[in-house]
UniProtKB/Swiss-Prot annotation:
Database matches in InterPro entries: DUF2129
Name of the protein: UPF0298 protein LCA_1075
Keywords: Cytoplasm
Major localization class: cytoplasm
Native species: Latilactobacillus sakei subsp. sakei (strain 23K)
Location relative to the cell: Cytoplasm
Length: 96
């Protein structure tokens, strides 16, 4: 019995009013709700994401729907850490 990880896609749903947040639970996992900016962050299965986005766009209380850009981002920061260390070393050398 092996644990299989399902790929998930984050979806940002901008609303006119937050009264319908409970209704969004049927489309996916409500991860975060911003009361001030009136948006909800949902997680859905990656293979079902396009269909869910189309269904959400048709709802009258939804202003707009956008996909999360996180899967497209490079999450390897090792090269950036080395670059920061080099810059710190050069600044220290210049001060001396």
């Amino acid at each position: 019995m092996a644990l299989e990880m399902t790929q998930r896609q984050g979806i940002v749903v901008w609303l006119y009013s937050l009264r319908q947040v409970k209704q969004l639970r049927r489309y996916g996992l409500v991860y975060y709700t911003s009361k001030r900016m009136k948006y909800v962050y949902l997680y859905v299965d990656a293979d079902q994401a396009p269909a869910v986005i189309e269904r959400l766009k048709k709802l009258h209380y939804v202003k707009r729907v956008t996909r999360s850009q996180r899967p497209m981002l490079d999450m390897e920061f090792g090269a950036l850490a080395e670059l920061a260390n080099q810059e710190t070393a050069t600044k220290a050398a210049l001060k001396e």
